[in-house]
């Protein structure tokens, strides 16, 4: 059965985590914001939206089943990936009329156990203004594979992406948030139409002491 998403990249996802708080309870990080972002991606990809309450309740019901998989180690977490893909048995170029929404989880440790060397990418582009950068589209990740491999061949572990127009302004890092300490203040890249960071939106105005 040939699925439309296999040929058109009609797939998008979110990446979330569940942790245990000091009381041992399982908690989610900004689930309604993630639901909103999921729907923003859906609209951009011509896919159906999901009611935010339904999205969040689905996660809660799944965590009731998978709660024993949430690590107790405070540096570990349960990775959660909600995603949707087209299911029409059609190979033409058009939005699908049917989709499947799924969520899978797996326990994970710290992504990196030590500081890593990173490369500032000034040749290749992950996402451009007006494109699908703010949508968690599968094609965004495919665009990063080749430059990431080149960086790894040079001994780097990750990329820091710059703007597509001038390669002058830092936008984001590949698998993490990027921030700097400048004049005693914590500085993060501006939120743009290529990426939105909820960690950025969560950070208060911070002064490094």
Model regions and ranges:
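Single conserved hydrophobic/aromatic residue that forms the stacking wall/gate
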Residues: 1-8, 12, 200-209
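Conserved alpha/beta cores of soluble small-molecule-handling proteins
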Residues: 6, 10-158, 165-169
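Glycine-rich phosphate/ribose-binding loops and adjacent secondary-structure elements
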Residues: 136-204
